Swiss-Prot record:
It catalyses: (6R)-10-formyltetrahydrofolate + 5-amino-1-(5-phospho-beta-D-ribosyl)imidazole-4-carboxamide = 5-formamido-1-(5-phospho-D-ribosyl)imidazole-4-carboxamide + (6S)-5,6,7,8-tetrahydrofolate; IMP + H2O = 5-formamido-1-(5-phospho-D-ribosyl)imidazole-4-carboxamide. One of its GO terms (biological process) is 'de novo' IMP biosynthetic process. This is Bifunctional purine biosynthesis protein PurH. GO terms for molecular function: IMP cyclohydrolase activity; phosphoribosylaminoimidazolecarboxamide formyltransferase activity. InterPro entries: AICAR_Tfase_dup_dom_sf, Cytidine_deaminase-like, MGS-like_dom, MGS-like_dom_sf, PurH-like. Keywords: Hydrolase, Multifunctional enzyme, Purine biosynthesis, Transferase. Belongs to the PurH family. The IMP cyclohydrolase activity resides in the N-terminal region.
Amino acid sequence: MIKQALISVSDKTGIVDFAKSLSDLGVKLLSTGGTAKLLADAGLPVTEVADYTGFPEMLDGRVKTLHPKVHGGILARRDLPEHMQALEQHGIPTIDLLVVNLYPFVATIAKDDCTLADAIENIDIGGPTMLRSAAKNHRDVTVVVDPADYAVVLDEMKANGNTVGHPTNFRLATKVFAHTAQYDGAITNYLTSLTDELKHASRSTYPATLNLAFDKVQDLRYGENPHQSAAFYRDLATPAGALANYRQLQGKELSYNNIADSDAAWECVKTFDAPACVIIKHANPCGVAVGNDSADAYAKAFQTDPTSAFGGIIAFNREVDEAAAQAVAKQFVEVLIAPSFSDAAKQVFAAKQNVRLLEIALGDGHNAFDLKRVGGGLLVQSLDSRNVQPSELRVVTKRQPTAKEMDDLLFAWRVAKYVKSNAIVFCGNGMTLGVGAGQMSRVDSARIASIKAQNAGLTLAGSAVASDAFFPFRDGLDVVVAAGATCVIQPGGSMRDDEVIAAADEHGIAMVLTGVRHFRH
């Protein structure tokens, strides 16, 4: 039975109401510092921990709760007579409920003007110590680290005579150990990323020890293949506009491949300012277009490769209205992603309950790093978020691209970044015309892109081509020109750049270099 609670929180969300409910149930309240003042100002009967222990706070508040009367009351096992006799001998009452959350270390180091001294002062000592003590003794002590659990604890107490059951106590304890592990991980990441202890850590510095923390969203039916198990985890600091913020409106449970492909589609479509549509198959764009609205963009994107679009993932950067919904509903679609769906669009898909509708608010946030597991290790790199501006482009051929060609080149370059290497993308008039992806040789990607356009009945005459990396030889360039391209955008940087540029001049086309490569594996 919960008779006494100790409350000490940095995040004071809902704490006054929670403490009042505890007091109404006859629970004695202990507290520290600012939390004690807040509760007292609210008219609640509360005892300061310093008065309770008979020992004042000291060292500018660094020592408040590190006292045997606190930790003895938390750690004593109620089922062991010798523990209870020790408490009685030393005049220590039990503490049955601990409500603690920690100094805001992560929020502190996120500030641009944070110094090492600021960070150090926001490393909580007493809080984690109490939390771990209570979580260790969860058979006898209820421990709450998350304000979202206040209601759960109160409901159980009211239903069971001020008692919280073991299943809930165990769940709350595991939550505590996860929280303190994440907290210590953040401290380790920060301190080991400092190049000089007198300076603030550079955000581009990789820590000597890397701790990662994610919360499980759900178990998945299976992994990339049916014989593989899988689960989906969400970053604790999910950036605005990230896929993990999705809200599923309808449809079957998401699979591993659904989530992976949806991320590829969403990241690509977010980069466009105009209404855009991206169709993804096996993590590669098979159709991308901008248009007057979502329906127009979809119609153009679908034209690129209707065969591959079957069973694909489709993303929009504008609301899906009735017209767009009716167009999409004619095809077999696995997942549809958009910032919003009109009521009329939802009605259209209500007749297709297997279609998964994901709603995600637009945002320009991105993961800070890309992670890739290798045998026994982890590759970590900054995100490829580089978007080349027109002013950075360098025309290296005798012929300058026209204004229309430049628009097509920039569109093609934006798409190529999201195509698996080696990537060749034909574009024109705000849409992809042919996509060659994932080939071991660039010339084969060029041939495949040309064949794709041919199969879709699309002309490549006057088209623009983007290559995610340089042309190592002129053969790839010869293929795209033979298909009808009149301008090319590529990074440059090959030992044979001069030969490739000479070939472009020989063909009378325009070539633009970005100086930026977009390998994607």
